[in-house]
């Protein structure tokens, strides 16, 4: 510790008369104490230094082959390329052809960007003879699953059908339970007491009597309506007969005049037989 003087200053030690610390010298370059990795090659010796071989990483260059053509971005993707495109139809054939070629170029670029569209078409024509490509085209025409997504969609459809079957079985169980409940209700009705059965029979008889009374009242009202209609029709017939009788004498003179004319003609023929 530094001692504090009277005037408040510290006493500084004398470093001039202190000896420096001695360190050991560095070892020579080829000494065994030194790490061989740190040793530098001796240029004057002329010995050949072995050079480690470089590691060459081989990268798989993508090729447009049958497996790539039948992948998800290959021929199966053509099924949905033209889903959102609308062709104009007759009179616009050139525009429709341009849109078709543009979509095909986009599909070819996504599948294999290195080739131009013309070279891509030539390569696809050559690959059309491969068995894998032909089977893929057949599956597309027959609407069979090709990609993993198609199999997943089929599994979803199977699950939906299974759920429908489960719902149907549940409905059948509900129907059977309802039939069981009806059977239990019939058994419970059998187990009714005699007093309850007598009350039920009395209620049935009262309901039948009320129904018969209603039927009788309805039949009486119908008979009354029929009699009223018959009386009204009889009065109408009497009135019509009276009118006919009143009109009859007017027709009698016409008939009598005709008879008188015929008699006069016969008398003239008898009085003048030689006129003919």
UniProtKB/Swiss-Prot annotation:
Which residues carry the post-translational modification Phosphothreonine, per the record? 233
Instruction: List, alphabetically, the GO terms of the cellular component aspect.
Output: chromatin; cytoplasm; nucleus; replication fork protection complex
Location relative to the cell? Cytoplasm; Nucleus
InterPro entries (alphabetical): Csm3, TIPIN/Csm3/Swi3
Q: Which GO terms describe its molecular function?
A: DNA binding
Q: Name one Pfam family in it.
A: Swi3
Q: Which keywords does UniProt give here?
A: Cell cycle, Cell division, Cytoplasm, DNA damage, Mitosis, Nucleus, Phosphoprotein
Identify the stretch(es) annotated as Interaction with TIMELESS. Answer: 64-140
| Biased composition range(s): Polar residues | 217-243
Region annotation Disordered: where it falls in the sequence? 1-54, 217-276
Q: Does the keyword Cell division apply?
A: yes
Offer one example of a GO biological process linked to this entry. cell cycle phase transition
Q: Which residues carry this modification: Phosphoserine?
A: 219
Q: What does this protein do?
A: Plays an important role in the control of DNA replication and the maintenance of replication fork stability. Important for cell survival after DNA damage or replication stress. May be specifically required for the ATR-CHEK1 pathway in the replication checkpoint induced by hydroxyurea or ultraviolet light. Forms a complex with TIMELESS and this complex regulates DNA replication processes under both normal and stress conditions, stabilizes replication forks and influences both CHEK1 phosphorylation and the intra-S phase checkpoint in response to genotoxic stress.
The text of the family note is: Belongs to the CSM3 family.
* Assembly: Interacts with TIMELESS, which impairs TIMELESS self-association (via N-terminus). Associates with the MCM2-7 complex. Interacts with RPA2, PRDX2.
**What's the protein here called?**
TIMELESS-interacting protein
